[in-house]
Amino acid sequence: MHRYRSHTCAALRKSDVGSTVRLSGWVHRVRDHGGVLFIDLRDHYGMTQVVADPDSPAFKMAETVRGEWVIRIDGTVKARTDDTVNKNMPTGEIELYAREIEVLSAAKELPLPVFGEPDYPEDVRLKYRFLDLRRETLHRNIVKRTEVISAMRRGMSDIGFTEYTTPILTASSPEGARDFLVPSRIHPGTFYALPQAPQQYKQLLMVAGFDRYFQIAPCFRDEDPRADRLPGEFYQLDLEMSFVEQEDVWDTMEPMIRAIFADFADGKPVTDKFPRIPYDTAIRKYGSDKPDLRNPIEMQEVTQHFAGSGFKVFANMIATNPKVEIWAIPAKTGGSRAFCDRMNAWAQSQGQPGLGYIFWRKEGEKLEGAGPLAKNIGEERTDAIRTQLGLEDGDACFFVAGEPAKFYKFAGEARTRAGEELNLVDRDRFELCWIVDFPFYEWNEDEKRVDFAHNPFSMPQGGLKALSGDDLLSIKAFQYDMVCNGFEIASGSIRNQSPELMVKAFENVGLSQADVEEQFGGLYRAFQYGAPPHGGMAFGIDRIVMLIVGAKNLREISLFPMNQQAVDLLMGAPSPATPAQLRELAIRPIPQKKD
């Protein structure tokens, strides 16, 4: 028999009754039932119940073991009685009667309980992550993450993609976030950068004559911590294709990603055909470029119903500013004054003056609008709004007014809030869609200039003619995102492979041809030697797994994450370098002034 085990803790079944076996694992918990000891023994694969009665030669040792000790047990497999069968465990029809117990490793008093998975301070969980990872839910999430990545690799291979790895040490480039810099010992005073994404390398692969590239790529960005992003690093399914238009990318990747969700969704419905929603439409309907389509609320413009109306606040705004619009947020079943007042109070807590509303109720046989706005605009306009929005008795509608560019985000948040408060969101499904036709440029208010809205390497719709025109902010890009349940899970584009277009695109944001050659020299040179039309995208693996397993945040699907202050509490990173290391790198730290 093997030194440590003949079976795993998930392997034994009723067919093994009578067998002598050896198991090794962690003591999940110990229970004393009338002098008989029950030990739940756990390993990576599962759990087995071990029994040690007073007559067993292993009983004295069993009395000494404690939670999370690592032990080896020899014993005989016996069937449980019908009334003690545990149908929730794969091994629930048997138990192991212990004959011998060996302690392989004792454990100190635990700073973090494993059994029961109670809520515990996150810093403790991260400092003792090796204990936290023993918890069933987190352990299962990590295994699921690996399974999803394996399925992605198989899926990409099945549709003709080949995995290539690109460099980790590369040159710094302005791609939207700060780089993590690595000092060069051989070339003092110079630095490598960890890649924010393999963007330029994968495009260079297409220029080099490869096709259908993919990799599971680590990406590094020195960003301020955010709730929906892990500090430091993340992983993406990165891909690129040659001789394609954007529809080719969509038609290739949609079935593959749908299959990933369907295979791991535990029976939850997954969108069959992903809708393709233009960016402008998404903003106007949902107030977001990553809408949660499980929420059925769709906003509509109702400006005409308030123009010249008795509600002077809106009417005067419309009369004095042609950019002003009134958007309606219909709320099915929200027709109570209490709910409307709650929404209004929430809006004020968000720094807004309030949230105007109308709700409808039957008075006898007549359906009437109620609330201050209804009184001010009158019955005819109120009923016209109800008819346009398809609202009925017991429904409500909220209104947001102003220039859409300034209020659409708040309107989207109000839509989300109403949907959640009214339980309109079906949480047991995956709703996926494409967001397409993103703006190529946007206005940088801080610097008072035009800037790239998203990926500077995207192909602008309209080509050089559009880039040379006067209305740069109207240019759309051949750029697209994939969204699931309100989260952006992928982004991509058809690339700009023309040196002339590349220079012009950057000139419009204030960079010269010399700047382009300095910052993107490799790509710029490559495009002068025969570059095929190409495009691709990248999927955020961590977010996809988070959605699949239903985790609350990304740390629940990551092995050894940093905390929100970008500190690795387990390994003690970041940490000071030694004087000798700094000398080798020709670096002298500058003392930081304390506030």
Curated annotation (Swiss-Prot):
Sites where the protein binds L-aspartate: E175, R221, H454, R495
Residue stretches in coiled coil: none
Enzymatic reactions: tRNA(Asx) + L-aspartate + ATP = L-aspartyl-tRNA(Asx) + AMP + diphosphate
GO BP annotation list: aspartyl-tRNA aminoacylation
Localisation per UniProt entry: Cytoplasm
Key words of the record: Aminoacyl-tRNA synthetase, ATP-binding, Cytoplasm, Ligase, Nucleotide-binding, Protein biosynthesis
A cellular component term, taken from the record's GO annotations: cytoplasm
HAMAP family for this protein: Asp_tRNA_synth_type1 (MF_00044)
Subunit comment: Homodimer.
Protein name (database record): Aspartate--tRNA(Asp/Asn) ligase
Organism: Sinorhizobium fredii (strain NBRC 101917 / NGR234)
